[in-house]
């Protein structure tokens, strides 16, 4: 089974968590693309979706799935999204696709966070994947200096502007032993919109695509 086939298997497995007549929170990325394709097969059973990126919104709408503004929705039963890394505590690094802020907002609203990944994303300690930070443009250099003080090596993601009009710093060389603590420390830096550590809001269910099939971790 290829990596893409493992992603697809995990994505389709998430359908069993979708409740009839509900609005589904939808993330961003290559694995979520498969989930949107899967969701299209049951689109008549759901009200619609809330999306974390313009890219996902366009794909949902291409299938005729209604996309709601989160401000119009008081509750979401599930949010389905991928991860760049995930540890045994279901803490994640996300934001490789630069949609981390909207992802974090929707995941905060959702009752359950369903994380869909292939088995290459499972790690013991977070940090091999550079940690994305969304930053107000004028604060980029200041935030970078503060991140160096925390032991990281921030790199400006050239040419990338988020859907919110901000920039991304990718922080290399972090071995994140205390994700909850670091998430709070980084978010306390003035000029940071949010960071790609999802520790405070960890995944509730992880569906892992493996060569042997989909494994469910809780």
Curated annotation (Swiss-Prot):
User: Which GO molecular function, any one, fits this protein according to its record?
Assistant: ribose-5-phosphate isomerase activity
Which pathway does UniProt place it in? Answer: Carbohydrate degradation; pentose phosphate pathway; D-ribose 5-phosphate from D-ribulose 5-phosphate (non-oxidative stage): step 1/1
Q: Which domain of life is it from?
A: Bacteria
Species whose genome carries this gene? Psychromonas ingrahamii (strain DSM 17664 / CCUG 51855 / 37)
The reaction(s) catalysed by this protein are:
aldehydo-D-ribose 5-phosphate = D-ribulose 5-phosphate
Q: What assembly does the database describe for this protein?
A: Homodimer.
Listed InterPro entries: NagB/RpiA_transferase-like (IPR037171), Ribose5P_isomerase_typA_subgr (IPR020672), Ribose5P_isomerase_type_A (IPR004788)
Identify this protein by name. Answer: Ribose-5-phosphate isomerase A
Enzyme kind, highest EC tier: isomerase
């Amino acid at each position: 089974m290829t990596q893409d086939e493992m992603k697809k298997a995990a994505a389709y497995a998430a359908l069993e968590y979708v409740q009839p007549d509900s609005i589904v929170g939808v993330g961003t990325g290559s694995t979520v693309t498969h989930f949107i394709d899967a969701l299209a097969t049951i689109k008549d059973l759901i009200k619609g979706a809330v999306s974390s990126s313009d890219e996902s919104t366009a794909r949902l709408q291409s299938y005729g799935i209604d996309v709601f503004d989160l401000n119009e929705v008081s509750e979401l039963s599930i949010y389905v999204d991928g991860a760049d890394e995930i540890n045994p505590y279901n803490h994640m690094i996300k934001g490789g696709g630069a949609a981390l802020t909207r992802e974090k907002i929707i995941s905060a609203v959702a009752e359950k966070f369903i994380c869909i990944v292939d088995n290459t994303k499972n790690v013991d300690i977070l940090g091999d994947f550079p940690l994305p930070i969304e930053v107000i443009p004028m604060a980029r250099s200041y935030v970078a200096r503060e991140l160096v003080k925390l032991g990281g090596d921030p790199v400006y993601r050239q040419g990338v502007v988020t859907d919110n009009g901000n920039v991304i710093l990718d922080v290399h060389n972090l071995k994140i032993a205390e994700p909850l603590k670091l998430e709070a420390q980084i978010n306390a830096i003035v000029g940071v919109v949010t960071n790609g550590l999802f520790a405070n809001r960890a995944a509730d269910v992880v569906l892992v695509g493996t060569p042997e099939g989909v494994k469910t971790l809780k």
